[in-house]
Amino acid sequence: MNGLKLHGISRSFGDHKVLQDVDFGVRRGEIVGFIGGNGAGKTTTMRLILGMLNPTGGYITWDGEPISTENRRSIGYMPEERGLYPQMSVKDQIVHFALLEGKTRGQAKEKADELIATLGLSGREKTLIQDLSLGNQQRVQLAVSLVGNPELLVLDEPFSGLDPLAVDTMAGLIQQQAAQGVGILFSSHQLELVERLCDRVCVLDRGRVMADGAVSELQDTDQTRWELKFDRPAGEFVAELSLVASFHIEFKMSNQSSVFITVDGRDATIPQDVLEIAARFGGMRSIEPVQRSLGALLSQDYISSGRGITPAREAELESAGQTR
């Protein structure tokens, strides 16, 4: 395949197997969501792609050729921990990283001007990073990842901490890069965004790929999901229902008047127990079948309750020389 491909990648830290037979890829122009619980191995996988770690087993290719220091220069990286200098101006920040990429000062200034215009930072060239909003700091961080004209962007939690307007802006910028043929791999715990943006999703759990495909493909299961909407918070309804339920119940604290029921069987009918308890509770405004959310898919089908290795623990083991 064109672009990035991981072939049976494994990685251990001491006796702890962090990744086991990880196999997936990112094509040019494709947006791939990389999701899983804390400790699933996402950060380790990204570090392997970037060459910060070597795999215990398996190999990585770029356009069908073994990945190397040279073709890794085609990868732009935006870490979760932002690496910006707070007392440097926006333009100087971008110029600095462009110089590190090997550009001349003239080329670096030209690239900075181009990215400032492209990413909506015009008028803020001389503003210090510490004086920018978090959303604009994220734009600068994205600009830094683009100074080398990458063919692949690896973004670790790019939406973390952003308000809704800044999220929409960042999402639009990512889509813009994909439309220009750049492959995008990003991790996020904001699953609604993953559903909205991604062509494909790769689900990692305890170091193994549990699913890899379009969200619509993952949602095409032999189960039916129903949404019940009430005219008031439905906590008491859920409490009574949970005593007799043989099906999955979702009750979101952010929207306490909606309850989601998932039952086995394609096009299955709503269980009679649910209707009877809803009638006793009263105030049901509607009931209709809906697609299972990505969050429901993960919690029910793909993500275990066990924890893997966290980035902090990974760093401890690595610094102690226990990696292999």
Annotated model-derived regions:
Residues 95, 99, 107-124:
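Conserved ABC ATPase "signature" region
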Residues 212-213:
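ABC ATPase "signature
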Residues 224-301:
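Short, charged/small-residue-rich alpha-helical element at the C-terminal edge
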